[in-house]
Amino acid sequence: SGALMSRIIKLWLLLFFFVPAAALSYEFPPERSKSDAETEFGWMVLPLPIVVEGIGSGVPIAAAISNVYKSADLLMAKTFFEGDFEINLFSFSKFPLIGDKLLFSFGFTDLNMPFRSYDRGIDSGKDDYYQTLEKYDSNFVTFQSQFYKQRLEFLVSYSTGGTKLEKIFDVDGNDFSNIQSPQRRWIDRVIGTQIDLTDNHLDPNEGLRIGILHSESNYGLNELSDYAVNDLNVTAYFPFFETHTLLFNAFQSRSYITDNGIVDENALRNKYGLGCDLETETTACQNAETRRINYWLKRNQSSKATALGGLNRMRAYSLGRFYAANSSNYVLEYRLNYSEKRTPINWIFLGGIRTVLQTSFFYETGSVSDDIARLHEKMKSSFGVGFRAIISGLIYRFDLAKGEDGIAPTLFINYPLSLGTLGS
């Protein structure tokens, strides 16, 4: 299997360095285009049921309004019905401060819902996790500058957040509430740039797109390590027939510690223990406690690169499923645009100008490792089909992917394989 993986990696390298050069040499960069429908007013309002086994359920109502003011978009979500979770989300993005040269975004999130933390590394199993029920809040501001018909972009973002743990659940649904150090806060700083040498900023058919993102997380706590992450995202688009597109995507993420926290297990256990002596299920509590201590101990020792799994990459796996100090991901996706007719939509829950209906087929392979020399020794894969509609400049996406953990659906706004909010 090692020899086979070596051949696969060499094939990817050939594809990314030689095929794009040959295919794009005819007209590169391609002529830039933009549809008037991208600036039309549009909306979507839908309930999004959330069910987490062993913890509970909730039904937030999500609303997206595109081009509410010039290029600015509005995104909101809130739980109006009684349930086990609470979600309050507001985001106002791409407000033009100086024409289309300087865009401003801001938003806040206020949640009371569960988060799942898996064991570290590519070998973690689908049941190797603990879950936390948390009160979570965050705020962000972002400035984006775009030049040369959005071919060149710069981004600066600042966000603060905090969380308070109310309960911890093990994989069997046992819950423990005697949590030491339940609160933590952080500050994130992000800078990035993107070079977009494609024919269309919203829905590329040909060309090359390169994005770089640097982020720093500062916890302000002596017990937790601060760290930084560098991400590189490269996507090459090749036109097939009149409206189809074949894309290759390569993603690399590297992280490193900027300020050391506690790396002694006993000292960390004193800070993040669960008081298992006070629990009825003592053994189950101790297992969950050990899993939590190992999570933070290894994160303090080796930091955490951008994880694989969820909405953007390795779509067959849960959000944040695979993580370590380094991660990589490679994707082959074929997109069939079978309708590009400008079609007005005026439904109660969905409206705007539809310009594209699309079906996609994709294959992904990726890995994570604390040792960069072993990053590609063992890979996980994901494959599936997606359905997308572009309505008034927003991309509504439903993907269905299969991997070792089973089949997973994704319902989201925006294409996959993006790099933060670059290009959005």
Which residues are covered by each model-predicted region?
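Transmembrane beta-strands of outer-membrane beta-barrel pores
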Residues: 51-53, 65-67, 79-85, 96, ...
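C-terminal outer-membrane beta-barrel translocator/porin domains of Gram-negative envelope proteins
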Residues: 202-352, 413
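Outer-membrane beta-barrel initiation region
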Residues: 23-106, 155, 179-205, 305-315, ...
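Transmembrane beta-strand segments of outer-membrane beta-barrel domains in Gram-negative
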Residues: 31, 114-259
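Outer-membrane beta-barrel translocator/channel fold
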Residues: 79-148, 175, 247-307, 400, ...
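Transmembrane beta-strands of outer-membrane beta-barrel proteins
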Residues: 43-45, 73-77, 102-106, 152-156, ...
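Cleavable N-terminal export/targeting peptides
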Residues: 1-32, 422-424
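Outer-membrane beta-barrel "beta-signal"
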Residues: 191, 387-391, 407-424
